[in-house]
Amino acid sequence: MVSSLLPNPPSAECWAALLHDPMTLDMDAVLSDFVRSTGAEPGLARDLLEGKNWDLTAALSDYEQLRQVHTANLPHVFNEGRCAKQAERELPQPGHKVERPCLQRQDDIAQAEKRLSRGISHASSAIVSLARSHVANECNNEQFPLEMPIYTFQLPDLSVYSEDFRSFIERDLIEQATMVALEQAGRLNWWSTVCTSCKRLLPLATTGDGNCLLHAASLGMWGFHDRDLVLRKALYTMMRTGAEREALKRRWRWQQTQQNKEEEWEREWTELLKLASSEPRTHFSKNGSGTGGGVDNSEDPVYESLEEFHVFVLAHILRRPIVVVADTMLRDSGGEAFAPIPFGGIYLPLEVPPNRCHCSPLVLAYDQAHFSALVSMEQRDQQREQAVIPLTDSEHKLLPLHFAVDPGKDWEWGKDDNDNARLANLILSLEAKLNLLHSYMNVTWIRIPSETRAPLAQPESPTASAGEDVQSLAESLDSDRDSVCSNSNSNNGKNGKDKEKEKQRKDKDKTRADSVANKLGSFSKTLGIKLKKNMGGLGGLVHGKMGRANSANGKNGDSAERNKEKKSKSRKGSKEESGASASTSPSEKTTPSPTDKASGASPADKGSGSRGDAWKYSTDVKLSLNILRAAMQGERKFIFAGLLLTSHRHQFHEEMIGYYLTSAQERFSAEQEQRRRDAAAAAAAATATATVKRPARRPEAEGAPGPERASPGPTAAQPTQLVLKLKERPSPGTGASARAARAAGGAASPGPGGGARRAAPGTGGPTPGRSPPAPARQSVIHVQAAARDEACAPTVGALRPCATYPQQNRSLWSQSYSPARSALRTVNTVESLAPGGADAPGPAEHKSQTYSNGFGAARDGLEFADADAPAARSNAECGRGGPGPAQRRCQRENCAFYGRAETEHFCSYCYREELRRRREARAARP
């Protein structure tokens, strides 16, 4: 294929030029080309192509813009898509790391294999296979809805490990890009920021083969992927032949738009059913031949992407609520929202009685057309923090409750859709939604600490406040109740006129309040909220006004009396809230009343029957309603959340975690060792490069005074180049980093003699507390020996003195001295003294080596341990004024330095060693 010939596509335009065929292509082929070229989720690819009328070039351009805007805050990807991954395998790059940007899953086929081979699922294939078999046997005992044990997976406590190992595990298991994107959008872990008693939830890395929804659900419960397609097959079976099939279909059709024709509904339902199949996706090539198993036969099978209705069906299979954390809009390169994301919200198993369901929800994350499991982390003190999932967003607005309405078996599509009375009976009020949440979950109100509690929510402008949302909500709720409680068939026209007048009156009141608030300066926002609260808000006179209007329109006295009661109760909402909060601990949970849970009535029947009396719910529901209304008005003192039960685990949980940690430790050690080898190789390469360039600069160094010649090494210009090369690399070890940090700070470093090294520029003689000359000269010897040994066997330890040596030489050339450099030079030099011989001066000799302004002062303050050194010094003084004589490579074998005729073509160090050897030979003669 054309895509396999491109190792690294630079942009979407290049892909468009190569993949776009001017001929009319089958939609499946176009979709396949788009997915193959970008690695995007098929669901996102289909949306982009449909938005551009299946124009591949335009869709690829939009995708490129989306990728660019979302990679601003995330690491950049150098190779995108499945084709780039194939080319990457052919041309491996050492140290190359690929991370997923915001709009491209890191879980294309190649990356999925990499992830799955390192995750908990593959820590021990025997243990995981045994666990899968056990789960499959449990699932086969039930017919269609799998009787799932209430398992909730938790990550092990990673705080007990070192920071490096913890970071390694987090990169291995956690979907970093998803976590960053959702946290920045304010959708994930905002509750742990405002309330420290709440645990953070972390998205687990999930493979992206089209089955990510069920993989994520399996990971969230058991810790392994749904490789055996147990959940996928159960999903398909329930949608095809399950007892709840018709009711689920009605709920799905009700939530969809009413724009489809009758024959289109069946076709849409058939397509939806086909998506749930466990059969891999089939792609048709341009010549009409079909290929199964993804893009080509060599890859793993790719399944059809699932939609939000499949999440709702999955909740019935698991018999437990599902909460999906997702952003609400997909945005283009300019930040403008161009497509909604409908997945976020709450999915309840409404076709199963609450007393037969698990109350602990399964929590999933959805980002970039990809699902991930959201799990918490174990802690030593489990009582200190609790695992919860808020049922509101960060603005304390209730999350969407998906597919909550079932019109019933007797609903006639196309006829009853125009009956306003029947439509009004199907509208769920806020109280009804809260009652469903209390029935299916263990909900709790978590108190927000006063120190992290946000001040009273202020409107962004005097004309756009939270009160408007509350007021519109109150209007819709009251209108729904009025439609239910009144005889709307007889008073339809009259009620419509009265409601229109009432709405105009409220708009006038709100406008008056805003105009007053605008004139009051800094006090306008708070006063504006209070005026709206009294004139048109949820906690003010709105219920009283509606009650009086209903009474004037001929409504019965019971309705007016009920509205008055609602008015008084809403006015007392803050008092009830404060009273309840004083007696409620942060961990205390409010549960539905026993009568609600004991009743086995269908939720649909319960919902329709409850609308006749909006206040028949339990006290917990009314308390939740009052607190939620107060939160929407700005008094945000609590978080409305569902409790996550993490105490139930399957019997193979501990074994899986143990095997994974053992495997991760081995891989971590291997990775660290590989990094050390790479660092040593890079250091050797840098040293070799510097050595090759050294001869061109050597005459300048040889023309310097004797003290400089006593330190064989590169010149002042060349060491700077070497230092820059070494600084571009990371430190090879923590010890070197610590020493470099101490050196940079000017700290004194203990030398071989045990004393702290300190020096001041400008001193010319011996000074008490000054470092002895031996350690300084030893560091020079150590550097040369290390440089000589690196050619044979480069080691990590050889990098450290080599990196400090040019700094010493540079300090001599610039006629300045730094105590930090002195401290850095003298580290780890004792072990290099052994080859120096017994005559080398020890640390106890009180000889000073001082660096000061001027070469003469520095020369006068230096002494040498051997007798022949002054001769070399005088020779250096003779050649000081002009360029040095011709030089050649040192005569000693394997020595990388250069010598001159005065030193018999030995370098200065080898020359001293040769003189010492001769003296010893003469002394040994009889």
UniProtKB/Swiss-Prot annotation:
The modification Phosphoserine is found at S121. The active site is at D209, C212 (nucleophile), H370 (proton acceptor). Residues 751-767 have a biased composition (Gly residues). GO terms for biological process: protein K11-linked deubiquitination; proteolysis. Keywords: Cytoplasm, Hydrolase, Metal-binding, Methylation, Nucleus, Phosphoprotein, Protease, Thiol protease, Ubl conjugation pathway, Zinc, Zinc-finger. Residues 484-494, 579-595, 680-691, 731-750 have a biased composition (Low complexity). Residues 455-517, 540-615, 671-779 are annotated as: Disordered. A motif (Nuclear localization signal) lies at residues 497-512. Residues 170-413 are annotated as: TRAF-binding. Deubiquitinase, which cleaves 'Lys-11'-linked polyubiquitin chains. This is OTU domain-containing protein 7A. The gene is Otud7a.
